[in-house]
Swiss-Prot record:
Homotetramer. One of its GO terms (cellular component) is cytoplasm. Keywords: Amino-acid biosynthesis, Arginine biosynthesis, ATP-binding, Cytoplasm, Ligase, Nucleotide-binding. Belongs to the argininosuccinate synthase family. Type 1 subfamily. One of its GO terms (molecular function) is argininosuccinate synthase activity. It catalyses: L-citrulline + L-aspartate + ATP = 2-(N(omega)-L-arginino)succinate + AMP + diphosphate + H(+). Signal peptide: none annotated. This is Argininosuccinate synthase.
Amino acid sequence: MSQKGSVKKAVLAYSGGLDTSIIVRWLIEEYGCEVIAFAADVGQGKELDGIPEKARQTGASKCYVEDLREEFVRDFVFPMFRANAIYEGRYFLGTSIARPLISKKQMEIALAEEAEAVCHGATGKGNDQIRFELAYYHFNPEIKIIAPWREWDLNSRESLIAYANKHGIPVPVTKKRPWSSDRNLLHISFEGGVLEDPWAEPPEDMYLLSVSPEQAPDKPEYVEIEFRNGDPVSINGESLSPAQLLAHLNELGGKHGIGRADIMENRFVGMKSRGVYETPGGTILEEAHRGVEQITMDREVLNLRDSLIPRYATMVYNGFWFAPEREAMQAMIDETQKTVNGVARVKLYKGHCRVVGRKSETNSLFDPEVATFEADEVYNQADAEGFIRLNALRLRIRSAMQKKHG
């Protein structure tokens, strides 16, 4: 049913890919409204080439292209990595963490353009629709949201490609490579197509950021990453901006085949889906961050922060970045990171990265005089007996009761 007249102007989160290329034309035909395209540069690289021209060719009146790379890494990726947030123990949340920033900027443009509506290209089965729309409502509780995938009858990749061909819309997708991808400075994700068979191995030519571990260099490479207050600030002694630092780690990790993950994850909407991810720089960063934390954080503080990881990661995955509980958790996590100052030395080799050295000039809690296995005068080993007996009390009581009652 036509919606013409209900909206005069809409701002579309535009990627130039299959869905959003078609949505520009569809919005004009279905709603009869002016369409303003917005493309967020969060590290897609050449994927953004020609975006303004493509948007205008398909009917958009304007196209904003905003360079958000530094803000993305500084204000979204780094805070998340202070929490060591990994969803279900595998997914580094590369797509999830980009959506709040894209939505934030999209809403700023909608306000400046006096647009009544915002629009996204997320499907009605996925998580992104939730992530976008929760953020939209955070910034404007009364905003009108248009989600074409929940309205139109173009319900498959094949039908979308046919629609595009019919209307002369160029799209960078062919039937030979039908899977979809989403790329930013933190990762690239792949889903759909051959990946919908959970038994099928991803084709090697799908990967874009990393070489196969089998084809990686035969010689390991070492990298030193410095952290201040839980954030990385330099690589091998060279200070870099947040976006530069992550981009450099992506190059190093990709060269050594680091950061590939093939995951069957649980979507917020209730279904399982398969995603294949490349997160080379993020994988190195998480390992290095852990290394510095281990030498600088108090045991109980570390355990407390780690207990929050599943909840924090799930909030980001489900789209609750702007929720008060995430902000409260972030404040606590950031407090724990004030002592995370130091350097981790990481070994990169054939798909693996591991910390092989860590140090902190200002916040190390490691005391070699206490930890040594050699003779020392700091630690009286006889004291351990009472400590053990006290901690064993509940176990001894339980054992005695079991014997008493058979």
